[in-house]
């Protein structure tokens, strides 16, 4: 049995709202090992902000403020990118905050992950196994859905080697002992989202 991280999802999902500075502070107070936040670019001013959903996001916290808080508290962040074409701006802000070695980048597609790694090799990046297939695949029905998941989970070790990612993030219902073995065989970590009950967490830890 290996090491397990407790990662606060979207800061820490309470009545304080998702992806807020107050949530980050609460996660720090509760002793989380890491904090996951969602990152987008705000339309009005181009600022990188903490937000899961599309929209104006005028009141969303700035990423730079979250980075400053995390650096002061000495806690790492998992930045889950919710759109593409953020690489250069993201790397610049991480360097300015001196957080390049204290973050893990997930989401946004493996192409963006590879480009971030090219721009700044010190940043760790993750390969996200999708929960759903694309709309055009969905139209082909259940059989293709099964095949799609097999492609991703059947030989994920080869995908890791091809993309040079440090870890895999996967929806907890897709996790199997075989998948865990393949990820570890590739020298990578497996991160699971988002189990919310003790029984599911215990089952995953036992793998």
What are these language model-derived features?
Residues 1-207:
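Phosphate-group recognition and catalysis centered on beta-loop-alpha active-site segments
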